[in-house]
Regions:
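Basic, short loop/linker segments at the boundary and entry of helix-turn-helix/winged-helix-like folds
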Residues: 24-68
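Helical catalytic core of nucleic-acid polymerases
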Residues: 41-43, 52-53, 59-60, 84-96, ...
């Protein structure tokens, strides 16, 4: 019979040299060397006043190492970070075997709001000294992530006031019903009556508390307005966050925006914004990144950041830029026929309506018989549309507008080919723009010419390969799937910490401190 060496699982006292656990070339080694030799954390140390009295505090440098190492391993929960500090030898090594409580870790991250920008900038400056910033092209983009906020507790001030009124009416109705039930109940016949009353009172107290919190919120918070004027929805749990439409549905969260250098994918600017509008983020992100740019650095962004106002401001400040518009790919022959390669939506996650089958294109204006001399328009079904305006203006361009009638459009057999949403749209409208008119969007037309040139297309094509791998690294490798804090300053701190992890990882890959 075969014989094997015995397996002894009894306790062992094994010598571990903590410093030897930090191997050159790894992220943790670069992080340890970077914070100990490069960072000036005196501003964090100045927060403590325990020189003569009070217990010793955890070193801010050690706390920063722990948090950044945890984020690099996909650990964001302060309780999970506390656990690995006690169990993982790598965390023991980088912290000198200190084991801060989860409350200490959470308080440290929350308290970095005022200092995080300076610390983040220090990492960028070190990347620059290592020659990792090329300054030829910066790519700007953002990722929308859920936050620690309830999507159900959001709405305009009018909607929240209506919600409070509905809760108060429900409380009155419940009180009235409870009094009736109590009068019908005879003493001693219901042994559980006291417990039932306690349960009722608990529900009533919860409803009253909800209504009271909504009323207090409305009194202490003004209406939120978008840049274009309409009221934005407020949120009771985190009023800095916003409702945002994504490919996976609507979320309550923040946009984590980043400006990335094309040379080695170093993040040169990062900011978390409680807004789903990307157009409003373009200029602030460029302003943050200009400290690391030159006069020749080209700023690139996708169509979400495109607006005439943004392009005008870039032109006035003489900032080289390539900002795509919504029709850029349609003008590019390389993308002709790309729709046949698109996969269908995932019914479990994608809540958008299924795309129309191939060959189901809608009627376009050229399918209508328009006679400018006789002022008439005949639809593909042979019905006459009536004129609803000869000199209408849209984006500065003049056009002649026609409308159908319910009498003709509702029973029409071609509704599905004519209307985008035939189930909700009763009639078809069509506009014919006057020919030969110059576009009033002067800066947009200039950007189109620039981005459609051979040089513009070649340079813009590098944008997606510059910025998308950064978000892929943060979201999937580092498992950043949501922000865990509330309030824009704290969420911005968490976003910058993750961006620091990415930059330090780049330093480690390029031989920092070896």
């Amino acid at each position: 019979m075969a014989r094997f060496k015995a397996v002894n699982m009894s306790p062992r006292f094994l010598p571990v040299v903590l410093e030897q656990q930090l191997v050159p070339g790894t992220f943790e080694y670069a992080l340890h060397a970077l914070i100990d030799s490069e960072f000036d954390l005196s501003v964090l140390a100045a927060k403590f006043r325990n020189d003569e009295t009070g217990a010793p505090a955890y070193d801010p440098a050690v706390m920063l190492k722990i948090v950044l190492l945890a984020y690099s391993r996909g650990l964001v929960s302060s309780r999970a970070i506390e656990r690995v500090c006690a169990e993982n030898v790598l965390f023991m090594a980088i912290s000198g075997d200190t084991q801060p409580a989860y409350t200490t870790i959470a308080a440290f991250v929350r308290g970095l709001s005022d200092e995080i920008t300076a610390i983040f900038t220090e990492v960028i400056l070190i990347c620059d000294r290592q020659g990792l910033i090329g300054r030829q092209m910066f790519a700007i983009d953002g990722v929308k992530l859920p936050s620690n906020a309830s999507k159900a507790k959001s709405g305009t001030h009018a909607e929240l006031a209506h919600q409070a009124q509905a809760i108060e009416r429900r409380v009155k109705s419940m009180l009235k019903e409870h009094r009736k039930r109590d009068r019908r109940s005879e003493q001693g016949q219901h042994p559980d009556l006291a417990a039932e009353r306690a349960s009722r009172q608990e529900r009533l107290d919860a409803l009253k508390s909800d209504a009271k919190s909504i009323r207090a919120f409305l009194q202490s918070n003004a209406q939120r307005r978008s840049g274009k004027g309409p009221e934005r929805k407020s949120n009771l749990t985190d009023n800095d966050s916003a409702k945002m439409a994504t490919g996976k549905g609507v979320i309550q969260g923040y946009t984590g925006a980043a400006t990335v250098d094309a040379s080695h994918q170093i993040i040169v600017a990062a900011q978390a914004h409680g807004s789903g509008s990307e157009q409003s983020l373009l200029i602030p992100m460029i302003e943050q990144a200009r400290a690391f740019a030159t006069a020749q650095t080209v700023m690139t962004a996708d169509a979400g950041y495109h607006s005439e106002a943004n392009l005008k401001q870039l032109s006035e400040q003489a900032i080289p830029a390539l900002i795509a518009d919504g029709l850029m790919r349609r003008r590019d022959a390389r993308f002709k026929g790309q729709d046949k390669y698109k996969t269908g939506p995932d019914p479990l996650y994608d809540k958008r309506p299924a795309p129309k089958p191939a060959g189901s294109g809608k009627f376009r204006p050229e399918d209508f018989a328009y006679d400018s001399q006789k002022n008439t328009c005949i639809c593909p079904a042979g019905k006459r549309l009536y004129s609803s305006g000869q000199h209408c203006t849209t984006n500065g361009r003049t056009h002649h507008k026609f409308k159908g009638t319910k009498r003709d459009c509702v029973p029409c057999a071609l509704r599905d080919q004519c209307l985008r949403t035939p189930e909700t749209t009763p009639i078809r409208q069509v506009a014919f723009f006057h020919k030969g008119l110059a576009s009033p969007l002067r800066h947009t037309e200039a950007m189109k010419r620039r981005i459609d040139s051979a040089a513009g297309r070649a340079l813009y094509a590098r944008r997606i390969a510059t910025v998308e791998p950064v978000f892929g690294n943060l979201r999937y490798n580092k498992r950043l799937d949501r922000f865990t804090l509330r309030g824009q300053p704290k969420v911005d701190t968490q976003w910058k910490l993750y961006c620091m992890v990415h930059n330090i990882e780049k330093l480690a890959h390029h031989g920092y401190a070896q």
